[in-house]
From Swiss-Prot:
This is Large ribosomal subunit protein uL1. Binds directly to 23S rRNA. The L1 stalk is quite mobile in the ribosome, and is involved in E site tRNA release. InterPro entries: Ribosom_uL1_bac-type, Ribosomal_uL1, Ribosomal_uL1-like, Ribosomal_uL1/biogenesis, Ribosomal_uL1_3-a/b-sand, Ribosomal_uL1_CS. It comes from the Bacteria. Disulfide bonds: none annotated. PROSITE patterns: RIBOSOMAL_L1 (PS01199). HAMAP family: Ribosomal_uL1_B (MF_01318_B).
Amino acid sequence: MSKLTKKQKLAFSKIEPGKAYTISEASALVKEITTTNFDASVDIDVRLGVDPRKANQMVRGVVTLPHGTGKQIRVLALCSPDKEAEAKEAGADYVGLDEYIEKIKAGWTDIDVIITMPAIMGKIGALGRVLGPRGLMPNPKSGTVTNDVGAAVKEVKAGKIDFKVDKTGIVHTSIGKVSFSADQIRDNAREFINTIIKLKPTTAKGTYIKSIYLSSTMSFGIKVDPKTVDEN
């Protein structure tokens, strides 16, 4: 492991070993300990007491963060011609169909989200090898396969994200930027955690939320006390 810089040592010294911080404290502290020269992402890791290998314990969902993600989300709308104007007006960065399908087949993936329609999914199935590994495959459960293309584009642009538990039982996502206020980070974290709580599988036994950590790009993780999620 490389040696810590002076800035990193100072940041590390601000975290009390073994302490679980309130969600408000952690949201303020993550801003203090970030030493990057760019607007780093604020990440959250929630470890769940589930067995993701069992289909009835898979946790997957969508959430619209109250303050957005702080990221510029590049949206491709693969839709029929009659929906193109609606998609463009909603803010889609790329709108079309066959020409973009051919681009993707050739390896183009400079996008963050694809919105499409049920009638078009047959054409998109062949793109699974390219889109699947990158997490770009549209899915009805995440609201990215719909006839209401305009509304779906607006939701994604406003900060809607989809998530799922990984094979180790952790849900990981970015919930903002360090340039956000501590209150904005707290609000986004709270919304994300409460959404996960609502999705608790009925078959999950024991403690559901095992641990919560907040961090930023290249920062140390800050342990959050789950009991404080709804505290101000």
